[in-house]
UniProtKB/Swiss-Prot annotation:
Name of the molecule in the record: Proliferating cell nuclear antigen
GO BP: base-excision repair, gap-filling; cellular response to hydrogen peroxide; cellular response to UV; cellular response to xenobiotic stimulus; epithelial cell differentiation; estrous cycle; heart development; leading strand elongation
Functional note: Auxiliary protein of DNA polymerase delta and epsilon, is involved in the control of eukaryotic DNA replication by increasing the polymerase's processibility during elongation of the leading strand. Induces a robust stimulatory effect on the 3'-5' exonuclease and 3'-phosphodiesterase, but not apurinic-apyrimidinic (AP) endonuclease, APEX2 activities. Has to be loaded onto DNA in order to be able to stimulate APEX2.
Pfam family, one: PCNA_C
Posttranslational mods: Phosphorylated. Phosphorylation at Tyr-211 by EGFR stabilizes chromatin-associated PCNA.
Residues modified as N6-acetyllysine: 14, 77, 80, 248
Similarity section: Belongs to the PCNA family.
Subcellular location, record wording: Nucleus
Gene name of this polypeptide: Pcna
Taxonomic source organism: Rattus norvegicus (Rat)
Per UniProt, location of the Glycyl lysine isopeptide (Lys-Gly) (interchain with G-Cter in SUMO2) cross-link in this chain: 164, 254
Subunit structure: Homotrimer. Interacts with p300/EP300; the interaction occurs on chromatin in UV-irradiated damaged cells. Interacts with CREBBP (via transactivation domain and C-terminus); the interaction occurs on chromatin in UV-irradiated damaged cells. Directly interacts with POLD1, POLD3 and POLD4 subunits of the DNA polymerase delta complex, POLD3 being the major interacting partner; the interaction with POLD3 is inhibited by CDKN1A/p21(CIP1). Forms a complex with activator 1 heteropentamer in the presence of ATP. Interacts with EXO1, POLH, POLK, DNMT1, ERCC5, FEN1, CDC6 and POLDIP2.
Amino acid sequence: MFEARLIQGSILKKVLEALKDLINEACWDISSGGVNLQSMDSSHVSLVQLTLRSEGFDTYRCDRNLAMGVNLTSMSKILKCAGNEDIITLRAEDNADTLALVFEAPNQEKVSDYEMKLMDLDVEQLGIPEQEYSCVVKMPSGEFARICRDLSHIGDAVVISCAKDGVKFSASGELGNGNIKLSQTSNVDKEEEAVSIEMNEPVQLTFALRYLNFFTKATPLSPTVTLSMSADVPLVVEYKIADMGHLKYYLAPKIEDEEGS
């Protein structure tokens, strides 16, 4: 049997909001260590990897490993029925074809329970190699979301240029071009407002803004976001989830066309 109780149920609601527009269905791998999900998006351009460690839940029990095929749109609809303050419990029998979701109001005067049908999914796990990155930028997640949103009014792609002193986001399109440069911050009162850059070598890469705007739906999960970049390997956009784990998105850079062609 699997049972996990999360007093801060809003975390699960935010996770689903961050996944559902990118992935239709995915396999939730449940083990004694926690909950993991790894899936390509429906157009096979980006990859999502979610980890929620068992110790981040308030109670957690998993007698044997489970692979639950979940329609994320359905799960998101059910989680919308939970209040932001609700305590959420997930429960499934070992060979179950349904997942139970129980929402308890904090005053315990209201309990809602839902059962969601599970799916049979054929899933291939992709190995994600450990990688050293040329540039790692940590910045406020709201700032990154705004930059991606603003530049998508200008063009379809963003060029991210990372140097020691700062990181530049540029886009160009029919109406012209736009550049946003963030300098490394030296002294900030709050750590989550800082921009920090670890650079081994400068990097300049181009990415589709459509996907970055999907990724920034995870902004409510974390006050900061980390961008890890190296030439010719996918960008990693990572949102830490409190004391529970992380949500990582991987996106391959666009290959620049030959001069003007």
